């Protein structure tokens, strides 16, 4: 539901407005009623008492809107649904209006209006609660300034030009509001609270936005301009005269509508009468309403669509009943299981009602009005989804650029960008778009998916908030001409009244094929590349992107996906030739074809040029000639000619072909895949090749693309045509310049097609990967999308179809894309997946020269091969131990599939859609499915899992083992207590588990507390918590130990049973709340007796500043190096603090931010009076009960007494701060900083290695992860730009030690650092696959 408050100031009194409004309504009803499909019927108009607002006038109308609804939408609605029922209660200065629609139960428009004598500055006219006010979007309408579509503009209705004859008012200036206030002239404001709801699958956001912007705002702007400019007609009228006019109009409309439908009015009147009889007292609703102004208006005041349907039950099936069933089916689907909290879609997506309205209604409807440039015919059938064919204009100004330039004049001082992932939405619309519709529809879809991203991240991916940016790249409507052409070929095209039959007959699959065969397709791809570079450049110049060094991903919809693919194919060509070479971008290996007949072009047996997908684009013009020998003057290009020179336009005969256009088109199509065909063994070089370098002007992307996401794209059909036209071309050779392609589609979408069978035919036997429902698995279901896992899981399929032929190899002509280690990681969701998948394609070092499809960036992630000669099976076992468990495929088949693949994961992904959609008219499905992608939480959560990592343990060990993927053992369930759902509506999780230390022969106990809110405002009481532990970290399996129930204080305590007793080591622990999948992370450290440890007081020894106003303190220079030194010596690191455990997430995030080594962290149990006593008791517990030994301690002067209490030698107590005589003999003061102290420890032999060898083996070297920071994967080119901007020289390192800088550089050079395997993740929403990132 979208809720907006419109404020409309007018230069008149409230009483005058009442007359003007009533007169305007009756006049417009009279003038705009044309009959069937467009008109108004007034069924009832009577006074009422004691109703909404007290006493007033009740009106019951029916609007026939069939001619104003898009054709595809009209085809799925029952005939009765083409009427909108209006019920209004007018009690000035308050009115209420409700619109409903028969047979469309989940649709309603509710408008509440107050009329005040002000200029619209009252911010709480409707007495909304704070929660309701936070949901509200305010939109001020100015009848003078707000633009009007050219098709609706009339000079006599322009307030800037109109002057009344009767009142002498007007014209109005643009500052009329200020002028009227200053001169104390009459002025009033209409406050309209509008709530629009259309709860149907796939259409909700788009339809609700369309109703607000076109059905409400646009209508209100025009109507209020008319109310002012028609004042000479209504000024001086009385209410009696208005009522008389209304009766005349009611009689006239009933007669006019009866001419077109003898059944419609009477039938609806019958339904209305039935409603009145059934409801009894509904004609006087205010009698039961305690609110005098009618704020409690409910649905029983509206015409009951259920009673309307009841009169038709039992009748034989008809188109009417089928259409009714269609809408009911998708409505039921949207509310499936709504009685259960967990399965309620709205409650699941939005934690609170406040978030629901706030997040989904951020789009400003002024964008629509500002972009209306061209007249729109009223008879336009697809107004909602039509796209504008006008040029895209960049919304930037000189002033903004000047500000940006001033801010980035010193790039070295610029803070790092918070944006880690940039999503460019290539929006081209559907294949049925005519290209002449609403220009803001593209931006509206982009805003919709942006809001869904924000909502999903806020609920389940909080660490990603603020780190993802989305920008629109509008694409030309390339299918518009093809759609217009094919529409004229329909056998029903002559019958305008048979819209459904004529459009259903359109062969949808032919539209993208025709579009990509058009000579204008080259310009479309060039335009997309240019606009994408422009959008990226504007983002880089903006404040949030000036230091951007993250990854860029493309999202292509039905049409935009085709353009994105071809743009990536061209961008991926190696630039080996010079810019001026005539061979650059051309295909030099071709075959001449035999001559056929005059005027006919013959395809070569192995013609070149990756066709854009059309019949005319399939052949190269150089591969064919006209029979006419007079065509000898077709120019030939050679190595010395300028590739940019245009062909002479001379003809020696009347050829029917525009050779210039066709040759440029052919050159473009060929250049798309020139690197593939250049090395075709079947092709021979021809010095007489004449391919223009027409694609040279296309340009390339100015940035590296990580992933390409396709939404319902018919790319498979286009590539299948290219394969048909060029039989020698293997589709897998058309490799786009990105690391992974994701083809998302709904199985019932007629526009979509699969890609995997084109790359490997045996995949036709496998279903596409099913994306889990967000409502049930908000963080994924843990199923692997890796190609390696698919090949092993379905090994029988590939073995049965295995052919004895040698594995295919990708052409060597395509150069490698050099990538950084960060780019390696971004290939797949998680580091471990890149290891597994890339290892499959590895055939040995020698194969690199022959199989460029096996990317070097994949091999860089692998450990160097053993110098000893090993068979392929042995190598496979080394790099992927998991493959040993399943029967292995022959390496021949594995290598063949991996060499063909566009990435290292599955490519085809199927989304859920209601089964009832298969019964919908075909013409309606492209629009419906296209709208569903932008508001789909399934799509958004899947995208998030691909582009980001959540768990710090997603980094690999030095030995190259895979990090285990965590998957929730149980799906979400309903809360055990009904009150829990209400208590947690507006609070975030703040769960924590105490770091546990145990002996291998003693009790191993883990305790946790589950709270919500930053100050533990809400306790999770009586709810289920699942306990998981990783048995053999980091590559072991997550084991579900037990399910606990929290007590009244939100605590749980679990003792690991003897059957699962842990040996010496550090084990990650997760406790997951069953009701909402929030979780807490911690570790249990099992140690042998006699283990030595070094203790650090966090605030006393690390903090260099005091935390004021909630800001994080600075870290003392060199502190991290000292802690790491003791860790390298084999000591257990203990961190103690007097802070309450409710701050655990914040403190651990601070430790992770500064790369402190991993250790056990001890917090106070809530707010305590004596935190020093807590520190002492914790250390005494370690020594007395666990038999550990303290070797050294660091802290402030306050900590001296704590360390003395555990009998620690003064020589091993190190205090940071000014020396005092009182403590001179009790400790060692660090006066020259940690750098000097570290030098003393190293070179004066004051620190010896730990004595317990078993402990040193168990305590692996590692650091805290980065909780609270979504560690997005970075692309190579942005890293290079960032590195080049880093300050150089030792003078810039005064705040950071040498070791810190080196560690970060090592982290950039190799992501296989053991440290983060033991990273600690901030308690947040659980991400299945957290260990290696998303699946």
From Swiss-Prot:
Keywords assigned by UniProt, alphabetized: Calcium, Cytoplasm, Cytoskeleton, Lipid-binding, Membrane, Metal-binding, Methylation, Phosphoprotein
Entry's Gene Ontology cellular component terms: cytoplasm; cytoskeleton; endomembrane system; membrane
Tissue distribution of the protein: Detected in retina and in the dentate gyrus of the cerebellum.
Listed InterPro entries: DDHD_dom, HAD-like_sf, HAD_sf, LNS2/PITP, PI_transfer, PI_transfer_N, START-like_dom_sf
Keyword Cytoplasm (UniProt): yes
Stretches assigned to the DDHD domain: 701-949
Residue ranges with Basic and acidic residues bias: 639-653
Family affiliation: Belongs to the PtdIns transfer protein family. PI transfer class IIA subfamily.
Protein name (database record): Membrane-associated phosphatidylinositol transfer protein 2
């Amino acid at each position: 539901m979208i809720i907006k408050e419109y404020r409309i100031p007018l230069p008149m009194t409230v009483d005058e407005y009442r007359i003007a409004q009533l007169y305007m309504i009756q006049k417009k009803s009279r003038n705009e009623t044309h009959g069937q499909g467009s008109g108004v019927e007034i069924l009832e108009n009577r006074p009422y008492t004691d109703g909404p607002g007290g006493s007033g006038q009740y009106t019951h109308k029916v609007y026939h809107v069939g001619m104003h609804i898009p054709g595809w939408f009209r085809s799925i609605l029952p005939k009765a649904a083409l009427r909108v029922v209006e019920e209004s209660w007018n009690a000035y200065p308050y009115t209420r209006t409700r619109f409903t629609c028969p047979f469309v139960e989940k649709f309603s428009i509710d408008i509440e209006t107050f009329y005040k004598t002000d200029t619209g500055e009252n911010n709480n006219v409707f007495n909304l609660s704070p929660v309701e006010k936070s949901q509200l979007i305010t939109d001020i309408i100015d009848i003078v300034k707000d633009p009007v579509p050219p098709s609706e503009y009339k000079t006599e209705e322009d307030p800037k030009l109109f002057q009344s004859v009767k009142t002498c008012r007007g014209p109005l200036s643009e500052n009329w509001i200020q002028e009227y206030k200053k001169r104390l002239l009459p002025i009033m404001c209409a406050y309209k609270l509008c709530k629009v709801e259309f709860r149907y699958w796939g259409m909700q956001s788009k339809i609700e936005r369309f109703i607000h912007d076109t059905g409400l705002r646009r209508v209100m702007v025009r109507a209020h301009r008319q109310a002012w400019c028609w004042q000479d007609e209504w000024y001086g009228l009385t209410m009696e005269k208005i009522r008389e006019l209304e009766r005349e109009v009611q009689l006239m409309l009933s007669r006019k509508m009866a001419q077109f439908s003898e059944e419609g009015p009477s039938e609806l009147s019958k339904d209305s009468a039935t409603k009145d009889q059934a409801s009894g007292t509904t004609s006087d609703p205010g009698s039961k309403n305690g609110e005098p102004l009618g704020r409690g208006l409910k649905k029983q005041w509206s015409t009951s669509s259920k009673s309307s349907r009841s009169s038709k039950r039992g009748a034989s099936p008809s188109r009417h009943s089928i259409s009714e069933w269609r809408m009911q089916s998708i409505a039921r689907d949207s509310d499936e299981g709504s009685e259960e909290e967990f399965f309620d879609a709205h409650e699941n997506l939005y934690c609170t009602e406040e978030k629901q309205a706030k997040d989904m209604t951020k789009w400003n409807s002024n964008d629509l009005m500002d972009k209306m440039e061209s007249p729109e015919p009223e008879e336009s059938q697809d107004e909602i989804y039509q796209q504008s064919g006008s040029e895209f204009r960049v919304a930037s100004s000189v002033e903004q650029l000047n500000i940006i330039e001033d801010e980035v004049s010193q790039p070295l001082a610029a803070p790092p960008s918070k944006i880690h992932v940039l999503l460019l939405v290539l929006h081209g619309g559907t294949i049925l778009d005519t290209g002449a519709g609403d220009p803001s529809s593209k931006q509206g879809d982009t805003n919709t998916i942006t809001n869904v991203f924000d909502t999903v991240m806020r609920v389940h991916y909080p660490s990603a908030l603020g780190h993802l940016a989305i920008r629109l790249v509008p694409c030309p409507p390339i299918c518009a001409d093809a759609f217009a052409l094919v529409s004229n070929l329909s056998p029903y095209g002559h019958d305008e009244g048979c819209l459904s039959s004529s459009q259903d007959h359109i062969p949808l699959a032919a539209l993208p094929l025709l579009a990509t065969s058009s000579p204008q397709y080259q310009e479309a791809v060039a335009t997309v590349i240019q606009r994408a570079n422009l959008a990226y450049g504007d983002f880089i110049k903006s404040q949030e992107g000036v230091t951007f060094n993250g990854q860029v991903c493309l999202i292509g919809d039905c049409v935009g996906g085709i353009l994105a693919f071809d743009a990536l194919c061209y961008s991926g060509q190696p630039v080996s030739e010079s810019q001026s070479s005539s061979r650059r971008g051309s295909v030099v290996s071709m075959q001449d074809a035999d001559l056929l007949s005059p005027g006919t072009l013959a395809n070569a047996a192995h013609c070149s040029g990756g066709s854009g997908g059309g019949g005319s684009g399939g052949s190269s013009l150089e591969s064919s000639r006209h029979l006419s020998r007079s065509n000898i003057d077709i120019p030939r290009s050679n190595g010395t000619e300028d590739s940019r020179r245009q062909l002479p336009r001379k003809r020696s005969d009347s050829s029917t072909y525009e050779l210039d256009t066709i040759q440029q088109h052919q050159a473009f199509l060929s250049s798309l895949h020139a690197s593939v065909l250049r090395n075709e063994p079947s092709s021979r070089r021809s010095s007489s090749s004449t391919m223009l370098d027409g694609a040279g002007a296309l340009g390339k992307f100015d940035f590296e693309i990580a992933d390409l996401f396709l939404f319902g794209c018919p790319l498979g059909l286009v590539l299948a045509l290219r394969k048909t036209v060029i039989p020698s071309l293997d589709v897998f050779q058309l490799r786009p310049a990105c690391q992974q392609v994701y083809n998302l589609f709904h199985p019932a979408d007629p526009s979509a097609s699969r890609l995997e069978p084109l790359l490997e035919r045996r995949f036709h036997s496998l279903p596409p990967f099913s994306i889990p429902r967000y409502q049930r698995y908000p963080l994924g279901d843990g199923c692997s999308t890796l190609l390696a896992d698919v090949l092993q899981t379905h090994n029988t399929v590939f073995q049965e179809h295995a052919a004895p032929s040698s594995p295919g190899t990708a052409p060597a002509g395509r150069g490698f894309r050099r990538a950084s280690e960060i780019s390696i990681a971004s290939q797949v969701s998680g580091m471990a997946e890149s290891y597994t998948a890339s290892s499959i394609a590895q055939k040995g070092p020698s194969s690199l020269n022959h199989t460029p499809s096996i990317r070097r960036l994949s091999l860089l992630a692998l450990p160097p091969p053993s110098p000893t000669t090993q068979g392929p099976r042995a190598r496979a076992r080394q790099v992927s131990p998991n493959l040993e468990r399943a029967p292995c495929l022959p390496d021949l088949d594995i290598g063949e599939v991996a060499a063909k693949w566009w990435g290292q994961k599955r490519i085809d992904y199927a989304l859920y859609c209601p089964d009832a959609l298969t019964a919908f008219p075909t013409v309606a499905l492209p629009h419906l499915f296209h709208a569903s992608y932008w508001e789909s939480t399934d799509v958004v959560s899947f995208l998030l899992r691909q582009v980001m990592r959540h768990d710090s343990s997603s980094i690999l060990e030095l030995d190259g083992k895979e990090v285990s993927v965590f998957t929730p053992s149980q799906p979400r369930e309903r809360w055990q207590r009904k009150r829990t759902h209400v208590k947690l509506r507006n609070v975030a999780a703040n769960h924590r588990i105490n770091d546990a230390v145990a002996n291998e022969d003693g009790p191993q106990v883990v305790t946790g507390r589950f709270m919500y809110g930053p100050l533990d405002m809400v306790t999770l009481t009586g709810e289920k918590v699942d306990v998981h532990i990783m048995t053999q970290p980091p590559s072991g399996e997550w084991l579900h130990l037990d399910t606990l129930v929290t007590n009244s204080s939100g605590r749980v305590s679990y003792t690991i049973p003897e059957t699962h007793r842990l040996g010496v080591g550090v084990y990650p622990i997760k406790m997951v709340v069953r009701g909402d999948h929030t979780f807490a992370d911690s570790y249990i450290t099992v140690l042998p007796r006699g283990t030595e440890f070094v203790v650090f007081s966090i605030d006393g020894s690390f903090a260099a500043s005091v935390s004021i106003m909630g800001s994080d303190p600075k870290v003392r220079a060199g502190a991290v190096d000292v802690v790491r030194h003791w860790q390298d010596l084999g000591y257990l690191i203990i961190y103690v603090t007097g802070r309450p455990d409710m701050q655990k997430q914040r403190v651990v995030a601070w430790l992770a931010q500064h790369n402190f080594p991993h250790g056990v962290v001890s917090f106070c149990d809530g707010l305590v009076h004596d935190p020093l006593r807590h520190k002492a008791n914790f250390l005494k517990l370690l020594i007395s009960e666990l038999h550990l030994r303290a070797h050294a301690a660091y802290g402030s002067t306050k900590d001296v007494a704590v360390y003395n209490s555990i009998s620690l030698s003064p020589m091993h107590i190190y205090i940071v701060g000014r020396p005092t005589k009182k403590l001179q003999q009790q400790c060692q003061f660090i006066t020259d900083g940690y750098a000097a102290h570290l030098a003393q420890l190293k070179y004066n032999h004051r620190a010896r290695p730990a004595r317990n060898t078993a402990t040193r083996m168990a305590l692996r070297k590692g650091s805290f992860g980065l909780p609270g920071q979504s560690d997005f994967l970075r692309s190579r080119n942005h890293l290079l730009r960032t590195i080049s901007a880093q300050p150089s020289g030792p003078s810039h390192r005064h705040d950071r030690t040498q070791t810190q800088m080196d560690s970060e550089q090592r982290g950039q050079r190799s992501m296989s650092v053991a440290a983060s395997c033991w990273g600690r993740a901030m308690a947040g929403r659980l991400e299945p696959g957290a260990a290696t990132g998303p699946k």
